[in-house]
């Protein structure tokens, strides 16, 4: 990138950071911390919880779904709901089934009345067969303060990756069905989406990528799940890893080497000591107040987990945190209390 482009990008980031800081200073007293999630297989819809103390999350809408699955043939689940509030609108994406080539999108101004759901197909039919996946999992929606657009990260296994026999997949043996990588699609209006492109590939099966801008260091922070079996000698997984980009250009992130695992197997943060039950997935990261907040799922152990950190290095694991029963893989997000219809 030329120096003039770098200077323009820096100026845009400074302006975005100033706007973000002003917004937090004004809105923080009236903001609510919310958590969207699903239960069981996702057939019942999207649920919503809130917290006043950051330790106990209570279900809203009398513990009933705030959004029910659209009746799409073969794509009628609402797993991994990711919600983002921006400029008065809640944007939501979700996994619509275990197999397929779409994810779902809908929007709302109050988390009660939703737009007509639409199917987003990030891989066009024009792509070669070996680049057409049969799964689109865990879409995570983000707003880019520099580009002033939105991007969705998600995981897919293409036949090309599955058949390369490099043993980078979940069980480390050639031919395993899933060898996910993280892809990206971008949009400005949620009507047209860019063609999916490979976004993060460090040579191992990965999923559940979530990113947040760090105003202090002027870069992006990513937390991602390594899907590989915890018993493998090379890159043992079922855990969460953290990395940072070199700057704020989300199209050219240039991520640094991964840290040691921060949650799940082979990490300092887990609840159940059994390797199979301490696996971590579905992270959600939020900056609120003076802390970073991290929620993740221990699906085999049956509990969501919560940790906080002032610097993304020293973590406090709040093992006593409470979430609604059977809550799974969701998203922490902030919104003005006046924008949320549900009071209980």
Where are these regions (language model features)?
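Bacterial N-terminal signal peptides
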Residues: 13-23
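Bacterial N-terminal signal peptides that target proteins for export
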Residues: 2-14
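Carbohydrate-active catalytic/glycan-binding domains of CAZyme proteins
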Residues: 25-344
């Amino acid at each position: 990138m030329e120096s003039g482009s770098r200077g323009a990008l820096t100026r845009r980031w400074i302006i975005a950071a100033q706007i973000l800081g002003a917004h937090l200073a004004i809105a923080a007293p009236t903001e609510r911390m919310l958590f969207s999630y699903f239960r069981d297989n996702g057939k019942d819809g999207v649920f919503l919880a809130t917290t006043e103390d950051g330790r106990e999350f209570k279900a809203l809408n009398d513990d009933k779904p705030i959004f029910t699955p659209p009746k799409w043939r073969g794509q009628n689940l609402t797993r991994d709901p990711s919600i983002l509030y921006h400029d008065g609108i809640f944007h939501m994406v979700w996994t619509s089934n275990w197999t397929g080539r779409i994810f779902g999108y809908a929007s709302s101004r109050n988390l009660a009345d939703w737009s007509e759901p639409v199917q987003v197909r990030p891989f066009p039919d024009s792509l070669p067969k070996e680049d057409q996946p049969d799964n689109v999992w865990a879409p995570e929606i983000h707003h880019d303060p520099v580009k002033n657009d939105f991007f969705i990260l998600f995981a897919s296994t293409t036949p090309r990756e599955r058949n390369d026999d490099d043993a980078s997949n979940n069980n480390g043996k050639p031919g395993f069905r899933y060898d996910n990588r993280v892809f990206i699609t971008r949009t400005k209006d949620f009507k047209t989406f860019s063609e999916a492109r490979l976004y993060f590939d460090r040579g191992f099966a990965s999923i559940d990528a979530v990113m947040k801008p760090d105003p202090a260091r002027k870069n992006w922070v990513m937390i991602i799940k390594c899907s590989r079996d915890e018993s493998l000698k090379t890159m043992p997984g079922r855990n969460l890893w953290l990395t940072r980009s070199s700057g704020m250009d989300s199209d050219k992130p240039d991520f640094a080497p991964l840290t040691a695992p921060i949650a799940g197997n082979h990490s300092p943060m887990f609840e159940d000591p059994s390797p199979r039950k301490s696996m971590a997935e579905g992270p959600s990261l939020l900056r609120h107040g003076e802390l970073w907040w991290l929620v993740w799922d221990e699906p085999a152990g049956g509990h969501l987990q919560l940790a906080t950190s002032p610097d993304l290095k020293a973590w406090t694991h709040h093992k006593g945190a409470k979430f609604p029963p059977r809550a799974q893989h969701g998203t922490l997000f902030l919104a003005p209390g006046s924008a949320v219809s549900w009071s209980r």
